[in-house]
Amino acid sequence: YCQKWMWTCDEERKCCEGLVCRLWCKKKIEEG
């Protein structure tokens, strides 16, 4: 379960809203 304010980024659940969060998510995915 994800809240909108949570910056969670994984394959099963994504709670990213806005450019900053999406960039953060992309960085976290690339880092593995």
From Swiss-Prot:
Disulfide bonds join C2-C16, C9-C21, C15-C25. Belongs to the neurotoxin 30 (phrixotoxin) family. It is found in: Secreted. Transmembrane segments: none annotated. Keywords: Disulfide bond, Ion channel impairing toxin, Knottin, Neurotoxin, Potassium channel impairing toxin, Secreted, Toxin. InterPro entries: Huwentoxin-1. The presence of a 'disulfide through disulfide knot' structurally defines this protein as a knottin. GO terms for molecular function: ion channel inhibitor activity; potassium channel regulator activity; toxin activity. GO terms for cellular component: extracellular region. Expressed by the venom gland. This is Kappa-theraphotoxin-Gr2b.
